[in-house]
Amino acid sequence: MITKLFINNYKGFDKTFIPIENVNFLVGDNSTGKSTVMDLLYLIDHNHNPFIFKFNQDSKMGNFFDMVNRYSDDKSYFSFACEKKIDDKRCFFKWKFTNDNGAASVVEYQSTANNKTIILSKKKNDNVELYTRATEDDFRLWIEHSTSDYFEDTDEKSENGLLFDLMVGDKTLFPKVLSQKDMLRFSPVRAQAKPYYDSYERDFVPEGDHIAFFLKSCFDKRNGKTNSIIETLNQFGQESSLFEGVEVESYSGSGSSSPFSLDLKYGKVKINISNVGYGVSQVMPLIVEMLRRKKTQIAIPQPEVHLHPKAQCAFGTLVFKNWRDNANSYLLETHSEYMINRFRYEMHHAEKKPKGEAQVLFFERTEGGNVITVMPIGKNGRFNCEIPDSYGDFFVDEELKMLDL
């Protein structure tokens, strides 16, 4: 899991250090950098090759000039770095990009390996110079010492040679980070519910289409784990007043390929999921994925979309309990104070506390660019910091906007 992020000269950020805890609520106005941070964390987490970043594959991040900091006087480069925990060890990684005919191209890559930092610097002849330097234990200090002033030994390889090292797994140049993916990320708008589904196995997709098939498998193969998932899902439905229970109905036979429907129970009445409120179809994939996973980082933009306040509170409760019981971690981009406050309430009253930390990352836009205020949430549910006045103003403004509806 990525535990720290550094962004320099990228989008609206300049030399910004961001801690990443087990539970992170990303809060702030539009265009303050929340999606930028979530996109960047996902991009780094799913990177396969240190010299190739696909900025426009999963998210449309634009060309070099879209990404370089428009507030900066120096628009020739941008960089980002991270601290990642791998097998209980902290590893550091850093990339620097310049303009290549409008595309963002890696010109320098640094990472820790074997108690040293290796630096790969790309040259105009497509060769890559290899440097080493001592490695600091502190991420911030490591970033400060990542300039050429601290480089030591040097060697030169062709880019093809380095790519060969990557393919054969030279651990001194390309550590395990390139094959270890920890994050699942949902899209801001989940798939619309269907009147019926064709049952076949499907892997995770950001829109949540796969959830119906997983739920059917839970009903087909009842055991302790699947019963727990179904019971917790029904409990959430009752606490949120969204539904009282979930059932699966097969249309022809009981085979794995039979079409089926997802029905929601309201007392003695069953209603097809496609005929209930839109908020149910938006939150159902989130809940099921949270319940089926353990020790997974889950990124969710706008989990509260189309949910009334009671359901937003129930979701805050579920996030807390799922973190505690399943050891999942969260990146939640949200405008819901109901969700955050219910999470803090659960933290305050829980006898069994989760392992790890939680925080609010409050994003603001200033004349000099985007800034982030880190607001740790203590084990007593209270903020362990001075709360900015603008944080309270943000939620008041959100409430005032609702008066226009």
Task: Describe every region a protein language model picked out.
Residues 1-194, 224, 341, 347-353, ...:
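P-loop NTPase switch/coupling surface
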Residues 63, 103, 162, 170, ...:
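Intrinsically disordered, low-complexity regions
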Residues 1-70, 83-85, 226-232, 242-405:
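Switch/communication elements of ASCE P-loop NTPase nucleotide-binding domains
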Residues 169-275:
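Extended helical coiled-coil dimerization/tether regions that scaffold
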